């Protein structure tokens, strides 16, 4: 179940939102063993897969998964944005697999692939599963969520606490919840460049043009109260800078034709 409706004031998000607390967020990394000569060159070519895990804590901040009514998806820790993209039309490039209280995401955009996964938090295992199910229901409005081990989950739930505990003793975020999906994402276009954490301010600075508009174009029909939240929403979408770049290219084409 979602924990909040309009409580995304910390990130300045407009509109109704649904949020879920996370225990962990993991980002799949493929470390290149460049400069490793000798017999291990074949292993170096394959790379060393590992997971960079972020924990929810008082020091680093709480991990939160947010889905805005507009279809925007975010994962944040405090004021830091870890993931951000639009779920609209995501069936073509986004794959999601559920395993117990964890979700594994695989994306392939412009021949670049990456993966990340989340584990939901809760006072009990049942509460974490409930939050995961609530998030899956919201995600299902935009993209299919695969549950290949649903039969296994039912068997584990039918077991006693001791048997279930033994089968779930390992940290699910450190396991490979769906090796086939990981292989599919990695083989689709090789290991993509993984984004590091970034702030909304830094992203705004990276696409803000230094030129100042002439006086004739300085007016705007949008008020500051409306424009601010809208821009923050756009900047938190990791594909927005590429969109701005495409718009700039088209504008240059138009001005070139007119000149």
UniProtKB/Swiss-Prot annotation:
Outcome when changing residue 27 to A: Strongly reduced interaction with ANKRD31
Main subcellular location: nucleus
Superkingdom of source: Eukaryota
Region (Disordered) residue spans: 150-175
Tissue occurrence: Expressed in adult testis and embryonic ovary. Also expressed at low levels in liver.
Pfam families for the chain: REC114-like
A single Gene Ontology CC term: chromosome
One biological process term in Gene Ontology: spermatogenesis
Keyword Ubl conjugation: no
The keyword Lipoprotein belongs to this UniProt entry's keyword annotation: no
Biased composition annotated in UniProt, kind: Polar residues: 150-160
Region of interest (Interaction with MEI4), residue spans: 203-254
Keywords from the named record: Chromosome, Differentiation, DNA recombination, Meiosis, Oogenesis, Spermatogenesis
InterPro entries: REC114L
Subcellular location(s) of the protein: Chromosome
Transmembrane segments: none
Function: Required for DNA double-strand breaks (DSBs) formation in unsynapsed regions during meiotic recombination. Probably acts by forming a complex with IHO1 and MEI4, which activates DSBs formation in unsynapsed regions, an essential step to ensure completion of synapsis. Required for spermatogenesis and oogenesis.
Subunit-structure text: Part of the MCD recombinosome complex, at least composed of IHO1, REC114 and MEI4. Forms a complex with MEI4; the interaction is required for MEI4 stability. Interacts (via C-terminal domain) with MEI4 (via N-terminal domain). Interacts with IHO1. Interacts with ANKRD31; the interaction is direct.
Family: Belongs to the REC114 family.
Protein name stated in the entry: Meiotic recombination protein REC114
Species of provenance: Mus musculus (Mouse)
């Amino acid at each position: 179940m979602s924990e909040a409706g309009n409580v995304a004031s910390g990130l300045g998000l407009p509109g109704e939102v649904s949020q879920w607390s996370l225990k962990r967020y993991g980002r799949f990394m493929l470390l290149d063993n460049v400069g490793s000569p000798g017999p291990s060159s074949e292993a170096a070519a394959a790379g060393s897969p590992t997971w960079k895990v972020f924990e929810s804590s008082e020091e680093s901040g709480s991990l939160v998964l947010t889905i805005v009514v507009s279809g925007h998806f975010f994962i944040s820790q405090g004021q830091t944005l870890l993931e951000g993209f639009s779920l609209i039309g995501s069936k073509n490039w986004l794959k999601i697999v559920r395993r117990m209280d964890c979700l594994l995401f695989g994306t392939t955009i412009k021949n670049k692939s990456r993966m990340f996964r989340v584990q939901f938090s809760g006072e009990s295992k049942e509460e974490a599963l409930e939050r995961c199910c609530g998030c899956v229901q919201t995600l299902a409005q935009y993209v299919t969520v695969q549950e290949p081990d649903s039969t296994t989950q039912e068997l584990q739930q039918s077991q006693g606490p001791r048997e279930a505990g033994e089968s779930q003793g390992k940290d699910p975020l450190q396991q490979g919840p769906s090796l086939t999906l990981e292989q599919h994402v990695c083989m689709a276009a090789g290991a993509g460049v993984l984004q590091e954490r970034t702030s909304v301010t830094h992203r705004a600075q990276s696409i803000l043009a230094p030129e100042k508009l002439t006086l004739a174009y300085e007016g705007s029909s949008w008020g500051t109260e409306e424009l601010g939240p809208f821009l923050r929403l756009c900047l938190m979408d990791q594909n927005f800078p590429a969109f701005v770049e495409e718009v700039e290219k088209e504008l240059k084409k138009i001005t070139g034709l007119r000149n």
